[in-house]
Amino acid sequence: MSAIELPPLRSRSEEAARAEHNAQTLAHENANIAGYDESPAVQQVETDAPETKGAPQASFKNYFRVFSYGTKLDYFLISLCCFTSIGAGTAMPLMNIVFGKLVGNFTDYFIPGSNVTRQEFEAEINKLALYIFYLFIGKFAMSYISMLAIRISGMRISAALRLAYLRALFAQPVSVIDTVSPGKVANRITTSSNIVQLAISQHFATLFQSLAFTVGLYVVALVKGWKLTLIASTGLPFILIVYGAMFPPFLRIHQITDKFQEEASAMAYEMFSSIRMIVAFGTESRLAKQHGVMLSKAASNEKRAAPLMGLTMSPAMVAMYGIFGITFWFGIKEYTKGRISSVGDITVVLFSVMMAVMNIGRVASPIISIAKAATAATELFVTIDASFHDTSGVMEPEVTGNAAITFINVAFSYPSRPGVPILKGLDLTITAGKVTAIVGPSGSGKSTIVGLIQRWYDLLGTTATAKKIDETEIPSSSTMASSPIEAVYDNTDKKSKKGKAGEEEEPEQDLGPNTCTGSLSVGRTNLRNVDVRWWRSQIGMVQQEPFLFNDTIYNNIVFGLCGTRYEGLSKDEKKIMVDEACREACAEEFISRLPQGLDTLVGESGIKLSGGQRQRIAIARSIIKRPPILILDEATSAIDVRTERIVQEALDRVSKNRTTIVIAHRLSTIKRADSIVVLRQGQLVEQGTHEELLKNGDGVYYGLVHAQELEMDAEDDDDHSSSLENIKMNDTKEDTASSGFEGHASREDSTYQNVGLLHSLGRLVVEQRHHWILYSVCCIGILGAGAVYPLQAYIFARIINVFTLTGPELVKQGNFWAGMFGVLAGGVGLSYYLLGAASHLISVELTRKYRSEYLSNMIRKPILFFDDKVHSPGSLTSRLSSDSQQVQQLLSMEMSMALIACTNLLGCTIIAFVYGWKLSLVGLFAALPLILGAGLVRTRLEIQLEAENAKVFENSSQFATEAVAGFRTVLSLLMEPMIRSRYDKLLKGHVVEALAKAKYGTIIFAASDSLELACMSLTFWYGGKLLASREYDLIQFFIVYTAIIQGATAAGIWFSFTPSMAQATGAANRILSMRPTSTDPSSYSPLPCSDEGVGIEFQHVSFKYQSRDVPVLSNLNLQILPGQVAALVGSSGCGKSTTLSLLERFYDASSGHILYNGQDITTFSPAEYRKQMSLVSQEPTLYQGSIRENISLSVESASDDDIKQACRDAQIHDFITSLPEGYETRLGPKGMSLSGGQRQRISLARALLRKPKILLLDEATSSLDSESEKYVQEAIERAASEGDRTVIIVAHRLATIQKADVIFVLGSGKVLEKGDHQALLRKKGVYWQMCQAQALNR
């Protein structure tokens, strides 16, 4: 298989207008999507989306444009498909010619006084039957070649399109990618791409074959009798007018529905990404309900298409049977006047036009698929066409990374807030080869400096890199939920939009021209003139929240070599560099203890490692390429004191002879810096060494240091022999779970029952039996539509027999039976209309219900379920979308058509046996089993192929969404080519695996598609013998023949839906398997009541993760009295956060007991037990929606007074009320429109609103600057001072827990020391040494 080739990325000048518009649209459509309830954004989409100028408009030209992603091989395969599809399509028109000759021979033989002998009749019949068999062979070969060719090209082009989308996404500016939800990426790269793939493969071949079929039939009809053909074609304009009027509104409705589905997918991704917080606060039901609101709006919109779906088949069927009546009526007139010499000519014209018109109805399915693909492709092309800038420039030797970085009079504001300057005339020189630390309060510009150095933004005079969105082209920000909070920072003290560490985060959309003046240079070269990729290869960066890929530790570190001169080294040479980097980052010790060592999988975002372990791997990754510039953005914030000291010494070593930029809030880490730069409000206010800056008692730096000082009043001692390095603390997994654990923790029921179609889908339908009215309408429609075929066989036989009559009787009988076709047309039209509309309503409602239930069941799974690497957020989001879509596709018109086929087959079998059992036995039990057997084998192959497709595309989707989630890391590490390469490799693997099965599956498909002709050949041959002996008359023969052919057609229709059935069955099984097992509530004990807080006791508790040989907790014993403030400290991996996880019952202990007021917590209902506690984690979790919604999420119902009091307790009320919209201010994704401290205090308010008996704080202030930490710390102390609440704090920064009632120092899974701050200092043990490391005044 040749490589998947892609067209080159478009230059800035190419298609500039379209690119500019799509860049605006991309930023617009990804801007903060409003959250929960009846948001204006959702209402706007529902009512105005089709008219919104900024929204991408679906166009069929985008469907055809998809083919431009093919290669010469693909174009050859497509051409071959077109040619062979024409051949396969013309088989039936040629068969009609033969059929006409047969009918003529039959009537000539049975006309009274005929001179045709039996021998002559049999010889002619044998010859014509053989011709039909030759047509079967030709159609089989052509069908196989066309379907195989288009499947190959369709898979290849689809893979190229997916890769182009991902490549274009990573070519966008940071400001644009920042606004892209990974959930949307998952939806587009799976669901949307799958829709496109289906439309450019199977449905493309079907459409082309159908067009050739239709044209061929009309050519045959016109040759046989052009007047009769024109009469027979009178229904065609009616069909074209109806379909032409139907599709535009159908496209608009579908496009709006897609928007709702994308929003629902984005929200689902957020939920899966923060599942621990959801479980801790018991918000599963509320968030699932909000997700259901979005799905309900999508369903309400999609129900508007029900009348249109009713017209999918109805017009074609009405026209077809109407044409039958009109054509026979006119043909009989012409026949009696001698203008038509043979009844065979009438039959050929009639059947040709009839089949052509009927085929127009069948063309509806691929056309609808193509219409959906046009919408899906438009969404993909918005990103693909978005403009980007040339990143090339000078590199070595013209410029070097070993040069000073100079800011000269730099003024900068983000595009989203052009009136809020972040940097104000900054003049700063970062000396080459020296360590420069940058400190300052939140919003002072620290992270902005890093962003400018990394060239996430450029200084361009008066405009920023991000594109400006023309507000006349898009809805107002209020309707699209571009965060209103951005507009109000002019009037607050917190003027910058902040992200990690409370610093400025890049804007989420561009709203106008912004200030970007001044000069930024490296040496004597302006940074704008430097090649971006080369420049980033000179920088090693460690961020505060390290992002690791779901890969091995080794690969995560080797990723640091991407885009550098070391990238091409051998594996052995890279291994040496990895080992060296691990030693320098102090990561070698804990890696060596892991069973798989460097080959250990780190899990989604490094979930299987502790925060300290993740950080050290990130440090190793940043220094492995030996960069001349090292940027450490809070590189040690998540590391314990012992590890911090070791890592800090390592960083001191690697910083030598290297330009190092350190951003830190924990000032103990930057005491040794060569220069400390103090920023305030975007300006440099102080600069010097640690000692020099401390001399200014009124300075900003002095105030920051004073806020972090520890009380060290214990008597000094010269005995420091027990160094931190000699304290053995197991560095095992701390913060999160691995793939499993030992003990009796709650596991998901992994039993997956792969039941059949009737059991799985039938169960879904039966459970919704309250829709019995719609079900009844569907049944009536199915019975009516299915009964048409036996009735058609009977009426057709009667009309053919009319031509054996003469004179007035011929005209009388002919007119009567022609009129009966008109009656049949009215009945079948009504049946199909009712069926199409009702089945669509059922499918929409069932899909809404079960997609909502699917997510609700997913988020109620045990935490272990989400620890599994196959259940990553991206994978689950993709599955949620694709499984629901597959079920809906089948439960709509597809299932109805399959049921009609069953009714048809049954009715045709009955009428055939009633009128001629001999011919029926031959036709139905000799030829038909071949069709059934081919279909069954095809079904099995399609199921296997579907399983492979789902597996591979799920993996590729997971990889893509993970890459988007960590895009800053991807850009910083120059991993874009590697990401594309690995994604390309995944896609190619899918293509190869899928095609291996497609070769055999296509044989069966071609057989089931063409065996109808073989059945006809056999029927005519044997029927001819029965007619020759006059055992059968014409009425008997044509009733049986038509019934057999209709039965074979029905079987073909049934098996044409087997791929959808296979996919939908698997999807339904997955949906049902997510249902939880019921638990008897009476088996739980009631919670003991207490007004003085809760006493917590660990009795001999041990805990071990399944993938770890070393236990995290080993016989842990500790007791916390009611109302106490307890702190847990210790090295990374000592079990601090695991202790909180056990308290939250994310996991259960392997052995021992955890007591809640003296009672084992495993005896309580987990939901009721968790209502007694609240968790505030290091990384606050906020969702799209208003501030009020985010705070009140933790309780079922809360009054305004309760919410405001919780915010006052969390010291965030004043800030919220300073916003123009106050508590109704809407937040963007993850609440990134707030600073870190503001997000943390909102999280604390949410926790306090529950009025918990137990408050758990897991590194709640570790990522905050001194100013924000002060606010949060005061809020925590206020919450703990009430005396009726037990507070448990996990912290690395010891200044935050020195006032705790009791401090537990953990190590090796046990308590090493306990006591209050002063008592532990007097011991001069582990805690004393930890304090020594953080004492800034020592």
From Swiss-Prot:
<comment type="function">
    <text>ABC transporter; part of the gene cluster that mediates the biosynthesis of KK-1, a novel cyclic depsipeptide with 10 residues which is a promising active compound with high activity against many plant pathogens, especially Botrytis cinerea. Is probably directly involved in the secretion of KK-1 and thus confers self-tolerance against KK-1.</text>
</comment>
<feature type="binding site">
    <location>
        <begin position="1130"/>
        <end position="1137"/>
    </location>
    <ligand>
        <name>ATP</name>
    </ligand>
</feature>
<feature type="transmembrane region" description="Helical">
    <location>
        <begin position="1037"/>
        <end position="1057"/>
    </location>
</feature>
<feature type="transmembrane region" description="Helical">
    <location>
        <begin position="816"/>
        <end position="836"/>
    </location>
</feature>
<dbReference type="Pfam" id="PF00005">
    <property type="entry name" value="ABC_tran"/>
</dbReference>
<keyword id="KW-0813">Transport</keyword>
<feature type="region of interest" description="Disordered">
    <location>
        <begin position="1"/>
        <end position="21"/>
    </location>
</feature>
<dbReference type="GO" id="GO:0005524">
    <property type="term" value="F:ATP binding"/>
</dbReference>
<dbReference type="GO" id="GO:0015421">
    <property type="term" value="F:ABC-type oligopeptide transporter activity"/>
</dbReference>
<feature type="transmembrane region" description="Helical">
    <location>
        <begin position="1003"/>
        <end position="1023"/>
    </location>
</feature>
<feature type="transmembrane region" description="Helical">
    <location>
        <begin position="312"/>
        <end position="332"/>
    </location>
</feature>
<dbReference type="GO" id="GO:0090374">
    <property type="term" value="P:oligopeptide export from mitochondrion"/>
</dbReference>
<dbReference type="InterPro" id="IPR036640">
    <property type="entry name" value="ABC1_TM_sf"/>
</dbReference>
<dbReference type="GO" id="GO:0005743">
    <property type="term" value="C:mitochondrial inner membrane"/>
</dbReference>
<feature type="domain" description="ABC transmembrane type-1 1">
    <location>
        <begin position="80"/>
        <end position="372"/>
    </location>
</feature>
<dbReference type="GO" id="GO:0005886">
    <property type="term" value="C:plasma membrane"/>
</dbReference>
<feature type="domain" description="ABC transporter 1">
    <location>
        <begin position="405"/>
        <end position="706"/>
    </location>
</feature>
<feature type="transmembrane region" description="Helical">
    <location>
        <begin position="895"/>
        <end position="917"/>
    </location>
</feature>
<feature type="transmembrane region" description="Helical">
    <location>
        <begin position="777"/>
        <end position="797"/>
    </location>
</feature>
<feature type="region of interest" description="Disordered">
    <location>
        <begin position="473"/>
        <end position="518"/>
    </location>
</feature>
<feature type="compositionally biased region" description="Basic and acidic residues">
    <location>
        <begin position="11"/>
        <end position="21"/>
    </location>
</feature>
<feature type="transmembrane region" description="Helical">
    <location>
        <begin position="203"/>
        <end position="223"/>
    </location>
</feature>
<keyword id="KW-0812">Transmembrane</keyword>
<dbReference type="InterPro" id="IPR011527">
    <property type="entry name" value="ABC1_TM_dom"/>
</dbReference>
<feature type="domain" description="ABC transporter 2">
    <location>
        <begin position="1096"/>
        <end position="1333"/>
    </location>
</feature>
<keyword id="KW-0067">ATP-binding</keyword>
<feature type="transmembrane region" description="Helical">
    <location>
        <begin position="230"/>
        <end position="250"/>
    </location>
</feature>
<keyword id="KW-1133">Transmembrane helix</keyword>
<keyword id="KW-0547">Nucleotide-binding</keyword>
<feature type="transmembrane region" description="Helical">
    <location>
        <begin position="919"/>
        <end position="941"/>
    </location>
</feature>
<keyword id="KW-0378">Hydrolase</keyword>
<feature type="transmembrane region" description="Helical">
    <location>
        <begin position="75"/>
        <end position="95"/>
    </location>
</feature>
<feature type="binding site">
    <location>
        <begin position="440"/>
        <end position="447"/>
    </location>
    <ligand>
        <name>ATP</name>
    </ligand>
</feature>
<feature type="domain" description="ABC transmembrane type-1 2">
    <location>
        <begin position="777"/>
        <end position="1063"/>
    </location>
</feature>
<comment type="pathway">
    <text>Secondary metabolite biosynthesis.</text>
</comment>
<keyword id="KW-0677">Repeat</keyword>
<keyword id="KW-1003">Cell membrane</keyword>
<feature type="transmembrane region" description="Helical">
    <location>
        <begin position="130"/>
        <end position="150"/>
    </location>
</feature>
<feature type="region of interest" description="Disordered">
    <location>
        <begin position="715"/>
        <end position="747"/>
    </location>
</feature>
<protein>
    <recommendedName>
        <fullName>ABC-type transporter kk1G</fullName>
    </recommendedName>
</protein>
<dbReference type="InterPro" id="IPR017871">
    <property type="entry name" value="ABC_transporter-like_CS"/>
</dbReference>
<dbReference type="InterPro" id="IPR003593">
    <property type="entry name" value="AAA+_ATPase"/>
</dbReference>
